[in-house]
């Protein structure tokens, strides 16, 4: 197998038989089945949950078309989930100042109307929703005794709204776009026996994916920071103004196996062909960023971004780059039964990725890159080279009766690169599509009419796509698909009537993705030197930006590894009790998590305290070091007559999960090192270093815009900062060090779930039907005690920024008695010696019930 470096899922679909069988099932949950409030760590309570509905209805049917020859199996499922967004109203959950937010929205409407535009957006995203329909059909054909064929078709139609309001981000309803996805798949399989010792498996498939974002009316994105304790976003989300992805994927697989004595030799090939069309034009209607509400009302734009296709080249502003690629795989494997109780499997696989199309040539950039000594061209493709994957595995049934099995293996696994990254190279050549990103906003005003989003001004922005200030994406000439070396060793054994498994897994990165921005250049100074601090531990390198907005290059890195060790015990009793307990310890370190579909974002949001083009190896965004699972299921059979064949059984289960909290990082809100990335991890200063920062004038006073009065002096900020540094659990023990990316985890989390179901059968004619009714209470822990079961960022990771750095506005009264404004670069710590570093997952921190019902016939 290939195409993955993490885990692979092999699914077996149901088939029809000579008898008609089917099922109807449903899952249901509403707002009355979710706890109204939950208690936080500080004793405060959450807001009411609000209304919600979550249901799924499905049906299956299978049976014969021609008895013993041709069968069918069909399924349908519809799901609908709607719930209130807790952060869209002024209920205390949001950190946004709703009064100021409404004033901003009123001004947007007024200014837009003055330009002939009616803005219909409203604050908040009251309803969140996910809808989906799933349909499937499978045909099985017993051609003859030696040949079996199947044809499988599936279709999924889904819609979900995204970018909705959070605790620190309030958005308008048109900012929260609909993500619509339609997926069709057709799979044909033919399994054949050839003679007495040979067989062949043939597999062909086609998958079509049509993804599209549907924003509101065309409107620029207006982003205002520091609206209370968060950010307000109005209009279309910048990455969704023009965003659609079409994918067609074709695969062919053939495995020919020869059984020769103790050897089963497989020769095979797996071919993949891809066709992509990716409409992606960020900032098509313009994106205007303001540092605070005061700047917004004054029209002081902090940052302006704009992008569109060059109509003279692409023919339209909404240009869809298209390209095709493939990956050809060939392999040989031998499964050797060395003895009756020892199997050895070994083989070799070669994969060859290939791109059939070439990005457009940007001659000016290619010359520029050559002058810089870079081996880069916009019209450069991935080199066609085989990627080898040798593998070896074994299974040793040591005592020949399955009471002690040792198994393991080692090998190389070749994956793919998300092709949406490759599509960036076709979009961002600086020829057919251009983008601007500037902090030099003099003369720029907000254009609310989407057709007037950009007006070329040679003194501010270039007028031709070949000029600089462009965003360029390119490949390193030796860029490879991802590869991992992986090894595992496990022991399965029985002891005291209990089944045990002990397993260890280790993975080492051979090729992984890293994004470098060639447009940032080291100045030769450190941050401490730039600030004039002689004995200051923050010695991160300083940068300046080059001639382009960004030059993002996909390269490979071999740093990174992960390992895990686990132990699991399972025991079943004759009276119907099943017990399971497991513990897993793991560690995962990466250079870049690659969690964004935009290549530039994978550079910008890869937090570092050093060179962003050579980031330090750090814990993964998804590193959960400890996990404990315990389950107990009691099955009660109410049939006292053992001879009865109709089930009448109740199952009661308790499932406990305990794990380390989500990883988190602390960064400085600003651009410390001048690279434009805003991704600088915080240096944790000592008290003496904080005092030196204050003495050097690096803290900027907080002042009142109306009166010019100082509301928080640099000295007060320094004292409050020291108080926070001495009280935060991780920070206080790492003074004089950098906060490494994801170096700490949130508090340990405990969750107990309860499951109850009853299954009973009844006769309908000659057949037996079954009805199963179930109730799940998820996070039952919270129902037992309101102080338990809180969850921080379920399944994700957190970033916190208690300290700000940048060009701060300072107001003071001049000699004439007027309040005047000036700017000073430095730090501000506006908290009062404390900073809340807990971001609760509102839904997952509540107990919730789910009802299930299923009829089988």
Map each language-model feature to its residues:
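Hydrophobic, lipid-facing positions within transmembrane beta-strands of outer-membrane proteins
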Residues: 5-7, 55-59, 133-137, 182-188, ...
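Acidic, glycine-rich flexible loop segments
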Residues: 3-8, 14-182, 196, 208-214, ...
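Extracytoplasmic gating/loop element in the C-terminal half of outer-membrane beta-barrel translocons
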Residues: 649-767, 772, 794-837
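Short loop/turn motifs that connect adjacent beta-strands in outer-membrane beta-barrel proteins
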Residues: 1-2, 16-21, 66-69, 146, ...
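Transmembrane beta-barrel strands of outer-membrane/channel proteins
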Residues: 24-30, 74-78, 151-155, 202-208, ...
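Gram-negative outer-membrane beta-barrel transporters
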Residues: 501-661
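Solvent-exposed loop/turn elements at secondary-structure boundaries
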Residues: 361-389, 394-555, 695, 747, ...
